[in-house]
A protein has these predicted regions:
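Catalytic core of Fe(II)/2-oxoglutarate
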Residues: 187-251
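C-terminal accessory regions
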Residues: 263-278
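N-terminal accessory scaffold of Fe(II)-dependent oxygenases
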Residues: 1-156, 160-167, 172-176, 223-225, ...
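Double-stranded beta-helix
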Residues: 155-213
């Protein structure tokens, strides 16, 4: 499948589609490293333009295992200034939901529109698109964790080593997924055996499958990377079931894990869709009456 000559994603010949279907990591190329929206100065301005709650920051000197909770949001009054001096201040920052700004939404959608033919049967199969920017000081560490979305991480500046692990048992994976929904932010309790490692340099990207443990070590320069995430119908449905189960656990009940009882799963997903729709309509009604 040939991509247009002005495309931003370089997926041909990488085995990306097959790896996606197997939910295995895969390397690919991209042409974003020189994009004007993704320079250090542009990202510093982006950090200042985003709502404070969309900026996460922490020290660059992290342990590989930090199992309890995640870093704080919104604590920096001028995050752009921190980004401009990352070579001095030993920090890393995550800018969440960059699609809140129209220019970044357009760039995100251009990239994911190019990816979609490789992974989806129908255009509607790529759901809940979101973009993130990660900027960090030299030799920073990102603790071991996993995400529930399909993720495409792409390096813009500097380099870093991305290492994947593999849960040794189904029970270990389920334990960590339950912890995620109960507030662990995906940060895992023990380091799993190493599965694969990739060296990310500008122009290189890697597909990160859902619920795949990984950790990151930066090189000797400031690192900038972009991650684009999305759900497919099956992963979106599982999030609904897991969200329902989390609510049940808060009521001191013990729900079955997704997949154990398919008919019950269907009812849980339907209930959460209805709950989400009610919240959406309630929010619209409040906005209209304000």
């Amino acid at each position: 499948m040939a991509m247009p000559p002005n495309g931003l994603m370089r997926l041909d010949g990488t085995g990306f589609g097959d790896a996606f279907r197997r939910r295995e990591p895969a390397q690919f190329g991209h042409a974003l490293q020189d994009h004007p929206l993704l320079t250090l100065d542009s990202i510093a301005q982006l950090a200042d333009d985003l709502p404070r709650e969309s900026v996460i920051s922490d020290t660059a000197d992290q342990a590989l295992l930090v199992p309890e909770g995640g870093p704080p949001r919104g604590k920096l009054p001028r995050p752009g200034d921190v980004i401009r001096h990352l070579d001095e201040n030993r920090s890393w920052l995550t800018l969440l939901n960059i699609e809140q700004l129209p220019a970044y939404a357009e760039l995100m959608n251009q990239c994911l529109d190019e990816v979609e033919p490789f992974i989806a049967d129908r255009r509607s199969d790529m759901l809940r698109r979101v973009g993130f920017v990660f900027v960090s000081s030299p030799n920073s560490t990102t603790p071991a964790h996993f995400d529930i979305e399909h993720s495409l991480i792409m390096q813009m500046q500097g380099e870093k080593r991305l290492t994947f692990g593999k849960f040794t048992t189904v029970q270990a994976e389920r334990h960590e997924v339950v912890r995620y929904w109960d507030g662990s932010h995906g940060r895992i309790e023990s380091l799993p055996p190493e599965l694969a490692a990739y060296q990310l340099t500008p122009g290189i990207g890697v597909y990160i499958p859902p619920v795949t443990p990984h950790w990151v070590k930066n090189g000797d320069a400031i690192s900038i990377s972009v991650t684009l995430t999305f759900f497919t119908p099956d992963t979106n449905r599982e999030t609904l079931i897991q969200a329902f189960n989390a609510r049940m656990r808060r009521m001191h009940l013990s729900p079955h894990y997704p997949g154990d009882w398919p008919l019950v799963d269907r009812a849980k997903a339907t209930a959460m869709r209805a709950y989400g729709l009610r919240r959406h309509l309630r929010g619209r009604n409040r906005a209209m009456s304000a």
